[in-house]
Amino acid sequence: MIKVGIVGGTGYTGVELLRILATHPEAEVICITSRSEAGMPVADMYPNLRGHYELEFSEPDASVLASCDLVFFATPHGVAMRMVPELMASGVRVVDLSADFRLKDLDTWANWYGMPHESADWAEKAVYGLPEVARDAIRDAQLVANPGCYPTAVQLGFLPLLEQGLVNPARLIADAKSGASGAGRQGKIGMLHGEIGESFKAYGASGHRHLPEIRQGLTAAAGKGVGVTFVPHLIPMIRGIEATLYAELDNPQDFDRLQALYEARYKDEPFVDVMPFGSHPETRSVRGANHCRMALHRQEDSNIVIVSSVIDNLVKGAAGQAVQNMNIMFSLDETMGLNAPALLP
């Protein structure tokens, strides 16, 4: 049984980790930390977990965390980079759901997150945890940087095109929409139901923190620099991401083989579903599930490839992918604890 700790358990990704791990046959959560809610029973904050956990939130205790086999960080940026080195020295393995170890260029990280990085050595050693790309490296990693939600949907949608060099890498567009849970659980006026209900807007159009992460992943896939325009949008639903992706095909005759290319690329990936050409994936088809569903489109004789990619931002975009990474790290069935279908309606 894997002894698991969770640092930062009061946000949406924290409770999603608890929900998934509650029925995981090979993992036991032995501690969950929150400075603000120390002493509160987990089930008092999250009534859906009544009967599943007797744990109380506790202050972070290095000795308790050091007794874990694996620790998940579901914290704001800047926390994990300060705590991880001590855990690494104790031999604990870590999956960090924050952005602290995702970027390899630490000047870029500091520019986007407004503080200097305090753990350069571990930032270099961390494995970027997109299983569909880095499964072997994840298996041996001590520290895994769990990908962001938008970057997961965008990278999975673009990967086959860039890996095969079929599109112009300088002209990529990602038009993405997310539910409100992507903004976290803190009380913000702009996220009140009365503010976002019956409304729809772009945000971060001049630059978003996930842009350098997307660019880093797509550059690796293409083997050369990429130019990507990424614009996120907030839509009035709780969870889910839809990313509509556009790329310019170098040879329009390649359209005829794109469906087969995508199906071949993802045929052995348990959590990627390539739908029939021309389908329209719905966010509700992945709600609560660790899946990415995608479909290809073409408008008349255009040389523009359109890919629609959907995920649940809290599952494949956060906690589910983190548990998937844990499974890989401990040589378990990758799908363990993650087989539940999406919730409908």
Swiss-Prot record:
Pathway per the UniProt entry: Amino-acid biosynthesis; L-arginine biosynthesis; N(2)-acetyl-L-ornithine from L-glutamate: step 3/4
Catalytic reaction equation(s): N-acetyl-L-glutamate 5-semialdehyde + phosphate + NADP(+) = N-acetyl-L-glutamyl 5-phosphate + NADPH + H(+)
SUPFAM superfamilies assigned to the protein according to its UniProt record, in alphabetical order: Glyceraldehyde-3-phosphate dehydrogenase-like, C-terminal domain (SSF55347), NAD(P)-binding Rossmann-fold domains (SSF51735)
Enzyme Commission number(s) of this protein: 1.2.1.38
GO BP terms: L-arginine biosynthetic process
EC primary class: oxidoreductase
UniProt xrefs under InterPro entries: AGPR_AS, AGPR_type-1, NAD(P)-bd_dom_sf, NAGSA_dehydrogenase, Semialdehyde_DH_NAD-bd
Location of the protein in the cell: Cytoplasm
Sequence intervals crossing the membrane: none
UniProt cross-references to Pfam families, sorted A to Z: Semialdhyde_dh (PF01118), Semialdhyde_dhC_1 (PF22698)
Keyword terms: Amino-acid biosynthesis, Arginine biosynthesis, Cytoplasm, NADP, Oxidoreductase
Main location group: cytoplasm
Similarity field: Belongs to the NAGSA dehydrogenase family. Type 1 subfamily.
Function statement: Catalyzes the NADPH-dependent reduction of N-acetyl-5-glutamyl phosphate to yield N-acetyl-L-glutamate 5-semialdehyde.
Protein name, as recorded: N-acetyl-gamma-glutamyl-phosphate reductase
Organism per entry: Marinobacter nauticus (strain ATCC 700491 / DSM 11845 / VT8)
